[in-house]
Swiss-Prot record:
Catalysed reaction, written as an equation: alpha-L-fucose = beta-L-fucose
Native organism: Shigella flexneri
Annotated residues for binding of substrate: 30, 107, 129-131
Domain of life: Bacteria
Name the record gives this protein: L-fucose mutarotase
Pathway: Carbohydrate metabolism; L-fucose metabolism
SUBUNIT field: Homodecamer.
InterPro entries from the UniProt entry: L-fucose_mutarotase, RbsD-like_sf, RbsD/FucU_mutarotase, RbsD_FucU
Gene Ontology annotations of biological process type: fucosylation; L-fucose metabolic process
SUPFAM superfamilies referenced in this protein's UniProt entry, alphabetically: RbsD-like
Function: Involved in the anomeric conversion of L-fucose.
Length: 140
């Protein structure tokens, strides 16, 4: 156990966050995301909510300031988004600094980004469209 490191952050996740360089991307996915069929390394965080993990990592993680650092999946035509999901994520991410805008991209574009991500963290999140991509920035 380390001081000031949230116990929600596993040693494997801490290692991945440290190894990521600026511009690298990490996905925090809901429990239904097809992470194991994609290329990046997969980290399990079963039972944890995405918002809780975001709150735990944001003191350690600099978001990119040169490109949109937050991306979520847009609803498929005919589906609706639950605004509470994005609100929870924004609240968690704004604990250190104002939360940047979250952009939405279509499902297949999100899958393409996920295939190129540094890692995917599968959580116990069950909210529909509960996946979020974070782009790492340069630590000041």
């Amino acid at each position: 156990m380390l001081k000031t490191i949230s116990p929600l952050i596993s040693p494997e996740l801490l290692k991945v966050l440290a190894e990521m360089g600026h511009g690298d991307e990490i996905i925090f996915s809901d429990a239904h995301f097809p992470a194991h069929s994609m290329e990046p390394q997969v980290i399990r965080a079963d039972g944890l909510l995405v918002s809780d993990l975001l709150q735990a990592i944001i003191p350690l993680f600099e978001l990119d300031s040169y490109a949109p650092p937050l991306v979520m999946m847009a609803a498929v035509e005919g589906d609706t988004l639950d605004p509470e999901v994005e609100r929870r994520y924004r609240n968690a991410l704004s604990l250190q600094a104002p939360c940047p805008d979250i952009i939405r991209i279509n499902r297949f574009a999100f899958y393409e980004r996920a295939q190129k991500a540094f890692a995917i963290v599968i959580t116990g999140e069950r909210a529909k469209y509960g996946n979020i991509l974070l782009k790492k920035g340069v630590t000041p």
